[in-house]
Amino acid sequence: MNLHSHSISSLQGALTVPGDKSISHRAAILGGLAEGVTEVDNFLCSEDCLNTLRAMEQLGAKVDVLEERQGYGPVRFRITGVAMSPKAPERPIDCGNSGTGMRLLAGMLAACPFDSEMFGDASLSSRPMGRIMQPLEQMGARIEARGAKPGCAPLSIHGGRVHPISYTLPMASAQVKSAILLAGMFADGTTTVRQPAVTRDHTERLFRHFGVPCTVDGLTVGTCGPALPVAHDLTVPADISSAAFWMVAAASRPGSRLTLRQVGLNKTRNAVISALQRMGARMDIVPTSPEDAGEPYGDITVYGSDSLHGTSLLPEEIPNLIDEIPILAVAGALGRGDFIVRNARELRVKETDRIATTAANLRLMGVDVEEFDDGMVVHGGTPLKGTELSSYGDHRIAMSFLVAGLSAQGETVVTDAECINTSYPGFERDLAQFL
């Protein structure tokens, strides 16, 4: 599927983007492990999250759909958990394109008294899994990576009784941290994870939401097992990573006034807001979540202008806006001066090499980009030219450059854009209302 965009005058009105991908994965897993029935609302019915939900069904959780998004899947459902006693799956678990799903499920499966297998698509099968294998094997699991590339999926997991560990992450990774904590729920004793930098804390927040012990002491996070999550209804906020596309679209078109509703405002995810504000974007943020919400959320109104300019992303920001770097690079191209990203080597092992794919597409639009092993410098200020671009099968690349097309001269075509359903089902519809 190819999608098209073209230059527009401004963006007006209000928009509600789909539920948060990171939180939806964790809601499916913890709701599926819990004792009792959890109602989940505003679940992200994308391919990635639906694969995780199906995996929990394979492991014994029961899902009753209450509301579906036509053509996509459940956005509201009740999940009856297995009370920390998953059953052995009858077939290998398909994680599709989702590194989050595979890594988090591996943490849980490592502690289960049966063998299991997980696989994914070609992109997922090239992404590094050794980073979770090492700590989980220290906890007592046996994991075989059977992919064509060393340390890559498919994974064969020989689970069983795990023991607690104290582990220091070699890189800032919320996925690895979460895999260890999920395994730690099954262990007898305290498991701790020390991070080199703060990473998104959705797992810690949802542990508390479901009554699982969780401690945070500076950069060290811990849990004490064995723990039994207790069912607790949850509303998933709108995904700030998906909202970021529209923040940039509105901020870069003078005269725009666009309100994004019920966007997650977790402080470990809002670095994209800080970065855009440093670049000259003007926003009003109104918190709207109740006191007992598992995750904070609110409405963000973005005002367009012609005064965007470059910035340097701070090293401590990188783990918390890693998914937004492609769209921030587009913002940098649309502004004046240099947009600088360093210390972001992790981009090389996302769904695509996002340093290379972002730089390649920007160059095709006429932008001067310097590429480094761990980042890039985007020299902004040159008018963008519409052209045909590849998504490279990467949802965030596809959406970033369709947004770029809203400020480009001529038509922009992004090929193989069906990958957007990985994280944002309905993006095509939302885009169409502004064209």
Swiss-Prot record:
<comment type="pathway">
    <text>Metabolic intermediate biosynthesis; chorismate biosynthesis; chorismate from D-erythrose 4-phosphate and phosphoenolpyruvate: step 6/7.</text>
</comment>
<feature type="binding site">
    <location>
        <position position="26"/>
    </location>
    <ligand>
        <name>3-phosphoshikimate</name>
    </ligand>
</feature>
<dbReference type="InterPro" id="IPR023193">
    <property type="entry name" value="EPSP_synthase_CS"/>
</dbReference>
<keyword id="KW-0808">Transferase</keyword>
<dbReference type="GO" id="GO:0009073">
    <property type="term" value="P:aromatic amino acid family biosynthetic process"/>
</dbReference>
<feature type="binding site">
    <location>
        <position position="323"/>
    </location>
    <ligand>
        <name>3-phosphoshikimate</name>
    </ligand>
</feature>
<feature type="binding site">
    <location>
        <position position="127"/>
    </location>
    <ligand>
        <name>phosphoenolpyruvate</name>
    </ligand>
</feature>
<feature type="binding site">
    <location>
        <position position="21"/>
    </location>
    <ligand>
        <name>3-phosphoshikimate</name>
    </ligand>
</feature>
<keyword id="KW-0057">Aromatic amino acid biosynthesis</keyword>
<keyword id="KW-0028">Amino-acid biosynthesis</keyword>
<dbReference type="GO" id="GO:0005737">
    <property type="term" value="C:cytoplasm"/>
</dbReference>
<feature type="binding site">
    <location>
        <position position="21"/>
    </location>
    <ligand>
        <name>phosphoenolpyruvate</name>
    </ligand>
</feature>
<dbReference type="InterPro" id="IPR013792">
    <property type="entry name" value="RNA3'P_cycl/enolpyr_Trfase_a/b"/>
</dbReference>
<feature type="binding site">
    <location>
        <position position="354"/>
    </location>
    <ligand>
        <name>phosphoenolpyruvate</name>
    </ligand>
</feature>
<feature type="binding site">
    <location>
        <position position="350"/>
    </location>
    <ligand>
        <name>3-phosphoshikimate</name>
    </ligand>
</feature>
<protein>
    <recommendedName>
        <fullName>3-phosphoshikimate 1-carboxyvinyltransferase</fullName>
        <ecNumber>2.5.1.19</ecNumber>
    </recommendedName>
</protein>
<comment type="subunit">
    <text>Monomer.</text>
</comment>
<dbReference type="InterPro" id="IPR036968">
    <property type="entry name" value="Enolpyruvate_Tfrase_sf"/>
</dbReference>
<dbReference type="Pfam" id="PF00275">
    <property type="entry name" value="EPSP_synthase"/>
</dbReference>
<feature type="binding site">
    <location>
        <position position="175"/>
    </location>
    <ligand>
        <name>phosphoenolpyruvate</name>
    </ligand>
</feature>
<dbReference type="GO" id="GO:0003866">
    <property type="term" value="F:3-phosphoshikimate 1-carboxyvinyltransferase activity"/>
</dbReference>
<feature type="active site" description="Proton acceptor">
    <location>
        <position position="323"/>
    </location>
</feature>
<feature type="binding site">
    <location>
        <position position="22"/>
    </location>
    <ligand>
        <name>3-phosphoshikimate</name>
    </ligand>
</feature>
<feature type="binding site">
    <location>
        <position position="99"/>
    </location>
    <ligand>
        <name>phosphoenolpyruvate</name>
    </ligand>
</feature>
<dbReference type="GO" id="GO:0008652">
    <property type="term" value="P:amino acid biosynthetic process"/>
</dbReference>
<comment type="function">
    <text>Catalyzes the transfer of the enolpyruvyl moiety of phosphoenolpyruvate (PEP) to the 5-hydroxyl of shikimate-3-phosphate (S3P) to produce enolpyruvyl shikimate-3-phosphate and inorganic phosphate.</text>
</comment>
<feature type="binding site">
    <location>
        <position position="396"/>
    </location>
    <ligand>
        <name>phosphoenolpyruvate</name>
    </ligand>
</feature>
<comment type="similarity">
    <text>Belongs to the EPSP synthase family.</text>
</comment>
<feature type="binding site">
    <location>
        <position position="173"/>
    </location>
    <ligand>
        <name>3-phosphoshikimate</name>
    </ligand>
</feature>
<keyword id="KW-0963">Cytoplasm</keyword>
<feature type="binding site">
    <location>
        <position position="175"/>
    </location>
    <ligand>
        <name>3-phosphoshikimate</name>
    </ligand>
</feature>
<dbReference type="InterPro" id="IPR006264">
    <property type="entry name" value="EPSP_synthase"/>
</dbReference>
<dbReference type="InterPro" id="IPR001986">
    <property type="entry name" value="Enolpyruvate_Tfrase_dom"/>
</dbReference>
<dbReference type="GO" id="GO:0009423">
    <property type="term" value="P:chorismate biosynthetic process"/>
</dbReference>
